[in-house]
């Protein structure tokens, strides 16, 4: 048996997230059906994470085992023939039999994009959060400095998050602005459900002047989801890279 590692890009707009589920079409389901058509056998993908409905990925990593002896390029060009335009396999590689995409990941890089302008942009609506009022990016960056380190992120998760522990390590949070776009890059060891989106929503509330930058430090010491910011829309979030 071979273990094949795939790097996948997708626009999550029309999907109910990565993971196969009873209600709604998932990215994983579409990929597994394409591989079934290519290989003539059903495979089960194991991924480096589970993006939520509407969240995008530039480099989701997933693996599967197969007895087929196809060349690696066939897993790219061949499978892509059976995939819709909003999902593509970028590369395929042989992996060790014990490779585990989520457990072996050293860090993940997420990017949250904000379109900060008075008037909405139809061309950016699927890949950014439109915030009308001007944001103070200097205040947002001051707030972001509190995130790196190992902290209790209970205030920055979904109410239905079932993680056994809310301790997570964040390596860096940076904010860059270019014209009307504000980009929040978050790199960390692992994330709770909706964690990056709540972080982004809280930083936007700092930028709006609703919170002082020190609110982030307070929330990490006093984890209360109700005292954090809104959950930013899924459309602005993208998984950029997974490091091993």
UniProtKB/Swiss-Prot annotation:
Keyword tags: Isomerase, tRNA processing
Example of a GO biological process term: tRNA pseudouridine synthesis
Active site: 52
Substrates-to-products reaction catalysed: uridine(38/39/40) in tRNA = pseudouridine(38/39/40) in tRNA
An MF annotation (GO) of this entry: tRNA pseudouridine(38-40) synthase activity
The keyword Flavoprotein is assigned to this record: no
Gene3D superfamilies: Pseudouridine synthase I, catalytic domain, C-terminal subdomain (3.30.70.660), Pseudouridine synthase I, catalytic domain, N-terminal subdomain (3.30.70.580)
One Pfam family in the UniProt entry: PseudoU_synth_1
Binding of substrate, residues: 110
UniProt-listed Enzyme Commission number(s): 5.4.99.12
Keyword Membrane: no
HAMAP family: TruA
Role played: Formation of pseudouridine at positions 38, 39 and 40 in the anticodon stem and loop of transfer RNAs.
Family affiliation: Belongs to the tRNA pseudouridine synthase TruA family.
Oligomeric form and interacting partners: Homodimer.
NCBIfam families: hisT_truA (TIGR00071)
Protein name: tRNA pseudouridine synthase A
Organism: Pelobacter propionicus (strain DSM 2379 / NBRC 103807 / OttBd1)
């Amino acid at each position: 048996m071979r273990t094949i590692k795939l790097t996948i890009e997708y626009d999550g707009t029309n999907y109910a997230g990565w993971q196969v589920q009873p209600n709604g079409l998932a990215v994983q389901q579409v990929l597994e059906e394409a591989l079934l058509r290519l290989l003539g056998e059903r495979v089960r993908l194991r991924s480096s994470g589970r993006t939520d409905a509407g969240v995008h990925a530039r480099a989701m990593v997933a693996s599967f085992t197969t007895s087929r002896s196809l060349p690696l390029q066939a897993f790219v060009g061949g499978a892509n023939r059976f995939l819709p335009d909003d999902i593509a396999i970028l590369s395929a590689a042989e992996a060790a039999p014990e490779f585990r995409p989520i457990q072996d990941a050293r860090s993940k890089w997420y990017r949250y994009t904000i379109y900060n302008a008075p008037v909405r942009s139809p061309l950016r609506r699927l890949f950014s959060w439109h915030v009308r009022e001007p944001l103070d990016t200097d205040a947002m960056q001051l707030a972001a400095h509190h995130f790196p380190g190992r902290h209790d992120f209970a205030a920055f998760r979904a109410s239905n998050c079932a993680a056994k522990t809310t301790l997570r390590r964040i390596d860096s949070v940076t904010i860059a602005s270019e014209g009307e776009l504000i980009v929040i890059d978050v790199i960390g060891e692992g994330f709770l459900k909706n964690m990056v989106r709540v972080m982004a929503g809280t930083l936007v509330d700092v930028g709006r002047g609703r919170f002082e930058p020190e609110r982030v430090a307070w929330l990490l010491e006093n984890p209360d989801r109700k005292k954090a910011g809104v959950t930013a829309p899924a459309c602005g979030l993208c998984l950029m890279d997974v490091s091993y």
